[in-house]
């Protein structure tokens, strides 16, 4: 279980997160939605060790992760697929995926994980020798998903996974996320598009100005008229 309690964090002395309380149960999928500047991506930066909170407690399975380095957090099984592409464009697809297991020193284990990931993501096999830079944005996103699974993570954080995708690739990404859900992994995703993110989540959290405005099931949030002012076009169900 992931728990944040009274977390304040920000940049240059200005808090972006202002007393965040959040709980993500093991094996569930939770989506954070909200307008630009609400603090969605800042939550992920704090959880990945890239930003230290000024105040507050963060625990993962009962262990405090405040002050841990990104590498230490990765070793706990917490991985993130960032919003911007993070592949090495000059390396082949399969080698990019293999690098996801750089912390593992058991060659046989790495190869076994690679085979498992190839079954889940056919693109790792069909484009194995192609340079990652030759792939479309959506294809690169699929490869990034594959790479993040090489460490068999316990918590996967996705920062706007549907951003900039064509309809066909978007459908592939959604199916991939659902496959990861069925494997029992815990998923925390951030989405600008409320309907997209909440439709594939069990739970949702709405952030407004660095604070939790509403949390509950995706149906509760989509149908709540009180938060329509956060989005153009009225309520979240119309977003």
Whereabouts are the PLM-identified features?
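Conserved ABC transporter NBD signature motif
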Residues: 56-64, 76, 110-114, 216
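The feature captures the beta-strand-to-loop junction immediately N-terminal to the Walker
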Residues: 33-35
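Conserved structural motif at the start of ABC-family nucleotide-binding domains
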Residues: 2, 17-19
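Helix-to-loop junction immediately C-terminal to a conserved catalytic motif
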Residues: 48
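Conserved ABC ATPase signature
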Residues: 131-135
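ABC-type ATPase nucleotide-binding domains, specifically the catalytic core motifs of the NBD
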Residues: 12, 30, 68, 91-112, ...
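ABC ATPase C-loop
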Residues: 148-149
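Conserved catalytic motifs of ABC-family nucleotide-binding domains
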Residues: 152
